[in-house]
């Protein structure tokens, strides 16, 4: 496929008997990706889909420069207009979370887990919705008490190809040793 204009896809991962973690690519994404696919997303349509899915919060895992490069610099204001809370916790593409992510994450993890416990929905996204998105989805499962190997398997079952790199997988497995 060379033109990415189809409906915005959110893969859903159940947690806490009713909470849902959503995994997706970057809403409103435009331009060519590394594989030569042309993305022509509508920010308004994608955010409407996120709203209709029932997201209480969205966590962007791309850097600010990536967000702008992807044509999604207006995401925070589009979400705010729909009363959806936006968090920005960037991770470098292909990498595991670093100390900057950990500092930001420590301020929001409890809020996200509380939303999930309240049977609410939290959407995670990076550029393609695979590496960083899958890593953080698995991290939320681990924080909810799921052992790392099972968390990885559950995330990969709902969104194949997630947690793309060995460094991301090692990061998750090390969380259980910490």
Predicted regions and their residues:
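Ser/Thr-glycine-rich phosphate-binding loops at phosphate-binding pockets of nucleotides
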Residues: 133
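Cys-dependent protein tyrosine phosphatase-like superfamily
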Residues: 1-123, 128, 136-178
């Amino acid at each position: 496929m060379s033109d990415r204009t189809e409906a915005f896809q959110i893969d859903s991962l159940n947690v806490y008997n009713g909470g849902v973690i959503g995994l997706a690519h970057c809403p409103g994404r435009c331009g060519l990706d590394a594989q030569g696919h042309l993305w022509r997303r509508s920010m308004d349509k994608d955010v409407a889909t996120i709203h209709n899915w029932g997201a209480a919060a969205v966590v962007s895992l791309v850097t600010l420069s990536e967000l702008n490069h992807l044509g999604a610099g207006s995401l925070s204001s589009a979400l705010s207009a729909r009363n959806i809370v936006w968090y920005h916790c960037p991770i470098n593409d292909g990498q595991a979370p670093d100390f900057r992510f950990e500092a930001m994450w420590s301020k929001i993890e409890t809020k996200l887990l509380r939303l999930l416990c309240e049977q609410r929905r939290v959407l995670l996204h990076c550029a393609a919705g695979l590496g960083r998105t899958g890593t953080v989805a698995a991290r939320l499962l681990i924080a909810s008490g799921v052992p790392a190997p099972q968390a990885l398997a559950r995330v990969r079952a709902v969104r194949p190809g997630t947690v793309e790199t060995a460094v991301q997988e090692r990061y998750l497995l090390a969380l259980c040793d910490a």
